[in-house]
């Protein structure tokens, strides 16, 4: 078999392959012999059809099958021989497939980039440390209470944090507009749910009162037909209800699946969850900085096939997340290209770090991660057992642990600055990660 390779771009290869005619004809003859044993031809018993008839009737189909099989087989033989690592299926251009002649074709494909991960010393990481203080715990308990607020009707003027039940009709230039009217809407004043000025205009209103509120839609309002326009809302207040926070008692604790009858026990469980959240937040921020540093220090070209595959995966995820009412291909690829490129580049870099440093998942750490996740459930032992009975889920955890080992490896070589901060600052969401160049 003759093989020649042309580098058309940094990653694209144009490989010409010639399969000897002898091999082609041998495969064609083999197919015809197989066909002869099972072919049904009028006037002949099965297995007794003359080869001349078999060739006349079936040789064309046999050659097409052989062409497809030999193209696939010889392509993979050639990439192994040439020590190439294809990043996707090739585009095939037939050149010659005549009887008695060599099978010749061109395969055009991309290869994975070859590189060594470098620049570890140029990476700067700020590693946060924090504790869950009693004040943080108190604040969290108040958040949990507010999340379970109920409202009771009152006969007084509405104030911020009250819930009002309203009917309203909105008009622009004296004309009602689509989406500008509703009946029986529940609205918590001060929640910021409505456009600026709407909720403020209801502060001080009582049940049965009608108010006219003038507002202006923001310039960046999602409905461009309304953006920047002045509107008048006629609003009828049907009822006013005041917020009532639940007491910290056994019934409240049970809503969170916590079998504790004492406030001390509940606080201990909440603190445990907050500490778990804190550890994960700190770990995530360190990881994001490491990954950003690796991206900046190792600009690499991405195979188009990998980028397209990742874009398609993100499209499918987006459709599933938002209800699946559209087809993935209806979403513009441009929406996902930046995120897809970051994922692909980081995937290549992380895989290369694993290879360079001969990393393997630490099974003790895998167990620790599973137990940490399981501790959030009521029956943690069952959750741990479930992971170890499901190879796919277990391998996903191993991948997470391996990625953490990559981060630890980089941290040993990077410049790391430790910083003590408050719990609130530590768990605050980080800025969006940098895109791959």
Curated annotation (Swiss-Prot):
Its EC number is 5.2.1.8. GO terms for cellular component: cytoplasm. Consists of 3 domains; the N-terminus binds the ribosome, the middle domain has PPIase activity, while the C-terminus has intrinsic chaperone activity on its own. GO terms for biological process: 'de novo' cotranslational protein folding; cell division; chaperone-mediated protein folding; protein transport; protein unfolding. InterPro entries: PPIase_dom_sf, PPIase_FKBP_dom, Trig_fac, Trigger_fac_C, Trigger_fac_C_sf, Trigger_fac_ribosome-bd_bac, Trigger_fac_ribosome-bd_sf, Trigger_fact/SurA_dom_sf. Involved in protein export. Acts as a chaperone by maintaining the newly synthesized protein in an open conformation. Functions as a peptidyl-prolyl cis-trans isomerase. It comes from the Bacteria. Belongs to the FKBP-type PPIase family. Tig subfamily. This is Trigger factor. Keywords: Cell cycle, Cell division, Chaperone, Cytoplasm, Isomerase, Rotamase. It is an enzyme of class 5 (isomerase). The keyword Cell cycle applies. Its main location: cytoplasm. Residues 161-246 form the PPIase FKBP-type domain.
